[in-house]
Amino acid sequence: MKLIPHLRISLLFCAALFTVTIIPAKSQQIAFTWDDLPAHSALPIGETRVDVGQKLIAAMKDAHMPPAYGFVNGVQAEREPLSAPVLQMWRDAGFPLGNHTWSHPNLNQNTIEDWQLDLLKNEPLLMKYMGDGDWHWIRYPYLGEGETAEKRATVRKLLAQHEYKIAAVTMSFGDYAYNEPYARCVAKNDAAAIARLDTAYLDAAVAAITYSRTMARALYGHDIPYVLLMHVGAFDARMLPRLLKLYRNRGFNFVTLQQAEADPFYKNDLDLALSPAPDSFEEAMIMRGLQMPSRPALSIDLDTLCR
């Protein structure tokens, strides 16, 4: 499901290198998390959702990654029944599932009552696949936590009553945006355009590393364990082996979501009885009057590529 712009994910549109001071990578931690299981975005001709799931799981296993949470929209299994096996594959691989709501509604554009119903509708599916495992993690669709402070606080109380924790996002590079153009380029058999996508995707990942690390150090004087937002798309599956190598080469170690969010930075995401904290690096930078790193335009026009 395609995302839309939001304060917390403004960095998703940064697919070129940022004009900020390059920070040399040291041994650093990152937790991969995956949204929109079991089906995300367009499929290239000849590829299935199961193919995508198998490639993602194989790449993570080959890299000896710890279990990565997949956040589920149950409606996708209903709309595309052939995608449903991806959920069992994910579990068979030892990877956990969390709640991304049933149909991906944006809390900022829906009533609390409607959004809560959609959240709870997803729970039987999660219980089916997770059993006694910890599925009480919520990834807000569109990362919308409520357009007002009052609404955000009310929803946090509701989530606390249902024993949820928030799966935060502290690094992202707009991976979702590459899946539709990839399907178009495959249909046109345009190898040159696909090669451009490959390069732009990896460049965007590098830019996001610099962007997030720059803000973390400006705010706190040091790195934190980052939580990376990814999507279960076909292009993501194509690129994952190279992406994992990129992070490793830049000094990152892979950890679980629980390990990353054990850092004090995330305490308000784990204990929803606490008052809401700034929900992004960007918001925290603005509140503290710090200068934001600059973000140039995309280096590739994803909307027109292979049209």
Question: What positions do the PLM features span?
Answer:
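C-terminal domain-boundary segment and adjacent tail
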Residues: 61-64, 168, 222, 232-307
